[in-house]
């Protein structure tokens, strides 16, 4: 039987323009060197605070920065995906803000193709496939953003709860926490099934996220390796200086 291996790098929440610029550079350099088969961004690639319901009728609602934030997001996505054959993105609550505000305020604008998220973020030009439903990232695993379910403050448990609800192992973002957990289903001394939940952290500049003061967040990303029927998910934690270790080799330039 022919042995095949597929490696996918999973990028956590970026929320441009609040992304950690040095970490983005380090991740892009790692992807260029590591040469995975695919890159997946797990959602919230852009923050879109200007059209958030929290900013409605507040000064932020009138800021003329949307175009600059969009262009920055497109540049970041290009940096992270230019060296792979496949690039993917899953739907998320922050990216949904564009659709939500149009539907609430000016629903007729939904007929304009340039306001669809795929066009707005130039995903077609970048070669990024957009998944509105859970993405089957590997055998027995799906990737979701993670905003459509109850959250647990313990890293990995929100993802595990999603996996138990969906009946498959789950890798997700949204919580900005990095961790994993698992549950086994056994009967009469035999393990029938093991479900995993993995949360991939974040890649934000926490100082720029002024809406939190002492968040329980961790910077990280993940590597999903599929080898025929076997799947290995490695959670890679980022050091305080923005560097990280992958399979015994250190990557990135320190801040």
Question: Where on the chain are the PLM-derived regions?
Answer:
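Short His-Asn-centered micro-motif
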Residues: 11-12, 42, 90-92, 133, ...
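A short C-terminal boundary segment appended to hydrolase-like catalytic domains
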Residues: 225-255
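Hydrophobic/aromatic beta-strand patches that form the interior of the parallel beta-sheet core
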Residues: 9, 40, 88-90, 169-171, ...
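Core catalytic region of metal-dependent phosphoesterases/phosphodiesterases
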Residues: 11-124
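Conserved beta-sheet core of the metallophosphoesterase superfamily
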Residues: 140-236
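Mobile, glycine- and charge-enriched loop segments
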Residues: 1-21, 138-139, 176
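Short acidic low-complexity segments
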Residues: 120-140
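Acidic carboxylate-rich catalytic motifs and surrounding loops in phosphoryl-/glycosyl-chemistry enzymes
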Residues: 88-94, 129-133, 234-239
């Amino acid at each position: 039987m022919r042995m095949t291996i597929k490696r996918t790098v999973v990028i956590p929440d970026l929320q441009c323009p609040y992304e950690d610029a040095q970490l983005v550079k380090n991740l892009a350099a790692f992807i260029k060197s590591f040469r995975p088969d695919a890159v997946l961004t797990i959602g919230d690639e852009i923050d879109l605070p200007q059209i958030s319901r929290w900013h409605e009728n507040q000064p932020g609602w009138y800021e003329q920065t949307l175009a600059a934030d969009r262009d920055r997001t497109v540049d970041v996505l290009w940096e992270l995906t230019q060296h792979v054959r496949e690039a993917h993105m899953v739907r998320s609550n922050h990216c949904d803000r564009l659709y939500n505000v149009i539907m609430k305020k000016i629903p007729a604008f939904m007929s304009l193709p340039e306001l669809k998220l795929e066009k707005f973020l130039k995903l077609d030009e970048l070669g990024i496939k957009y998944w509105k439903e859970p993405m089957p990232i590997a055998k027995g695993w799906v990737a979701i953003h993670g905003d459509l379910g109850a959250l647990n403050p313990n890293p990995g448990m929100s993802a595990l709860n999603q996996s138990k609800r969906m009946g498959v192992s789950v890798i997700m973002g949204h919580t900005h926490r990095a961790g994993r957990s698992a549950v086994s289903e056994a009967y009469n001394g035999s393990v029938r099934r093991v479900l995993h939940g993995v949360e991939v952290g974040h890649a934000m500049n926490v100082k720029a996220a002024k809406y939190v003061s002492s968040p329980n967040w961790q910077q990280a990303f993940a590597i999903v390796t599929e080898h025929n029927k076997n799947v290995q998910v490695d959670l890679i934690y980022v050091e305080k200086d923005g560097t990280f270790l992958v399979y015994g080799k250190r990557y990135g330039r320190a801040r």
